[in-house]
Amino acid sequence: MSFNDLGVAKWLSESLDAMKIYTPTAIQSACIPAILKGHDCIGGAKTGSGKTIAFAAPMLTQWSEDPFGIFGLILTPTRELALQIAEQFAALGANMNIKVAVVVGGEDFVQQTLALQRKPHFVIATPGRLADHILNSGEETISGLRRVKYLVLDEADRLLSNSFGSDLQRCFDVLPTSDKRQTLLFTATITDAVRALKEKPPTPGKPPVFMHEVETVDKVAIPSTLQISYVFVPSYVKEAYLNSILHLEQFKDSTAVIFVNRTTTAEVLRRMLRKLDFRVASLHSEMPQSERTNSLHRFKAGAARILIATDVASRGLDIPTVELVINFDIPADPDDFIHRVGRTARAGRKGDAVSIIGEKDIDRIQSIEERINKKMELLEDVNDDNVIKESLSATSVAKRESLMEMDKENFGERKKINRKKHGLDKVKPERVTKPKKSKK
């Protein structure tokens, strides 16, 4: 089966060949023909299965027959994912003079307004920033959205959660009604909210909603090539254990993503590990967009060996060469654990995931093990003796210096000010706390 066999335009098949993408994946083989036949579509497949091309290929095929703007709107929950999707659209349509605009927070608002007024062929946006333009940028800016032929919700399970509700509705209000556009939902996890959309009465004059789920997360939770282990530590020496894990013989040269639950933790670890001579980048919502983009590029290019991230990076981002995932903090939702460790052991490669477990994490670990139907193994190569001997002193000094720097710089204040300015100070999205001064 080739992309030509699925109905993809010849020029696009050639672009895919040039990118060394020769054979459609399961999600692409199922969804591309259905979308080309006019079906609304719900596609579920794990991260790294080619979901972006599953919706991009049919959209670009039909766009090339009638290349107006704005032809397609793709909404995504994170800025990084929006930039990544835009890169793929630009690469696929490079020979066709495709025009793509990215509308996300952290970038120049006026420049985005001008880009929307030029009516690009495709707009990739986060709901919050696009809603801001709809409210504030005038009819000339948003008029192109009223002609959109395709609406895509990527990582639909997150977009359909309550936190995006009002912004999404504001975006939907300026789009053509559902009978005059195709709506495509793609996600790694088909939740009840997503599945319920399939059960709605069909739109008159349109074919029924097509839904295809490839190896749901329940069935392929953990690849057989992924080694899952843990260390059990007192919370006050977690950082020292992290340092020791990164120095283990089997991990000392590995590319690694360290997941944390809070932006403050991400920043503490970034500064601390740099002081300990690790090549580190970080990705969290407290960083300006330019720094986030630069961090991702540094990590992809190998300039940074370690990426420290909140869960903003655990979905969808194309980081194909990760060899080690460390859960410095344990997520409350077992599915978030699955998405995190899904950054490694891809395409049959081996990978490791190590969780640093504290005394308060036992219930979460039990829920995770029940969800993945697998017990974690104790990582015996690191223990109290070698941590105390090799890591504790240097790590404690580096952590203390990092906390003092952050306190001096009022880390976290910018976000509080911005949220108050926009009337959002009573809303609790991603938790940001000002670091406490170290008692050591």
Curated annotation (Swiss-Prot):
Q motif (motif): residue ranges: 1-29
Pfam families from the UniProt entry: DEAD (PF00270), Helicase_C (PF00271)
GO biological process: endonucleolytic cleavage in 5'-ETS of tricistronic rRNA transcript (SSU-rRNA, 5.8S rRNA, LSU-rRNA); endonucleolytic cleavage in ITS1 to separate SSU-rRNA from 5.8S rRNA and LSU-rRNA from tricistronic rRNA transcript (SSU-rRNA, 5.8S rRNA, LSU-rRNA); endonucleolytic cleavage to generate mature 5'-end of SSU-rRNA from (SSU-rRNA, 5.8S rRNA, LSU-rRNA); rRNA processing
CDD domains: DEADc_DDX49, SF2_C_DEAD
Localization of this protein: Nucleus, Nucleolus
GO terms, molecular function: ATP binding; ATP hydrolysis activity; RNA binding; RNA helicase activity
Region (Disordered), start-end ranges: 405-440
UniProt keyword terms in alphabetical order: ATP-binding, Helicase, Hydrolase, Nucleotide-binding, Nucleus, Ribosome biogenesis, RNA-binding, rRNA processing
Record-linked Gene3D superfamilies: P-loop containing nucleotide triphosphate hydrolases (3.40.50.300)
InterPro entries given in the database record: DEAD/DEAH_box_helicase_dom, DEAD_box_RNA_helicase, Helicase_ATP-bd, Helicase_C-like, P-loop_NTPase, RNA-helicase_DEAD-box_CS, RNA_helicase_DEAD_Q_motif
PROSITE patterns (alphabetical): DEAD_ATP_HELICASE, HELICASE_ATP_BIND_1, HELICASE_CTER, Q_MOTIF
Family: Belongs to the DEAD box helicase family. DDX49/DBP8 subfamily.
Protein's recorded name: ATP-dependent RNA helicase DBP8
Primary gene name: DBP8
